[in-house]
């Protein structure tokens, strides 16, 4: 069974790892997890200017334990990549704004045989979102020298 998970994955944090782990579990014991990284242009439109570019985000995601396949998404029609990957399940993160029912309706309308499912909500760390990490960095005092940080 192939499960597809999507996201910006801009500054990796424990919430990303948990989302990917839970997404893969939706497919059962022998599931294959395909992760789609949002393009920089998509991240800019939906969230903010990404800190890390799409190619580096793709490389980081490939190293994560639950990930079997990784792709950069397409500009425009988000269903193009779904048609290419052909997942059995599309895992929607608990903090992603997609309406699962509307997504399922669109999949059905397009003849895509995938089931949209929401991953359960879990917060496991204080810095469990990219925005929280950015805010902490902005509020930090960096007066001391850092070693090996060119």
From Swiss-Prot:
GO terms for biological process: FAD biosynthetic process; FMN metabolic process. Keywords: ATP-binding, FAD, Flavoprotein, FMN, Nucleotide-binding, Nucleotidyltransferase, Transferase. HAMAP family: FAD_synth_arch. Catalyzes the transfer of the AMP portion of ATP to flavin mononucleotide (FMN) to produce flavin adenine dinucleotide (FAD) coenzyme. One of its GO terms (molecular function) is FMN adenylyltransferase activity. Its EC number is 2.7.7.2. Homodimer. ATP binds at residues 8-9, 13-16, 95, 122. Its cofactor is a divalent metal cation. Pathway: Cofactor biosynthesis; FAD biosynthesis; FAD from FMN: step 1/1. Disulfide bonds: none annotated. It catalyses: FMN + ATP + H(+) = FAD + diphosphate. This is FAD synthase. It is an enzyme of class 2 (transferase). It comes from Methanobrevibacter ruminantium (strain ATCC 35063 / DSM 1093 / JCM 13430 / OCM 146 / M1) (Methanobacterium ruminantium). Belongs to the archaeal FAD synthase family. SUPFAM superfamilies: Nucleotidylyl transferase.
């Amino acid at each position: 069974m192939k499960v597809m998970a999507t996201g910006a994955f801009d500054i990796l944090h424990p919430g990303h790892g948990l989302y990917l782990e839970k997404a893969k579990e939706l497919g059962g014991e022998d599931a294959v997890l395909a992760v789609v990284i949002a393009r920089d242009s998509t991240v800019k439109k939906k969230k903010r200017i990404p800190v890390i570019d799409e190619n580096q985000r793709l490389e980081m995601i490939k190293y994560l334990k639950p990930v079997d396949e990784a792709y950069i998404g397409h500009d425009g029609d988000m269903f193009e990549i779904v048609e290419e990957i052909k997942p059995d399940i599309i895992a929607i993160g608990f903090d992603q704004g997609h309406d699962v029912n509307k997504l399922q309706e669109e999949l059905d309308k397009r003849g895509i045989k995938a089931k949209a499912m929401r991953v359960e909500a879990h917060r496991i760390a204080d810095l469990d979102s990219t925005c929280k990490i950015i805010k902490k960095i902005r509020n930090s005092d960096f007066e001391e020298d850092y070693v090996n940080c060119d």
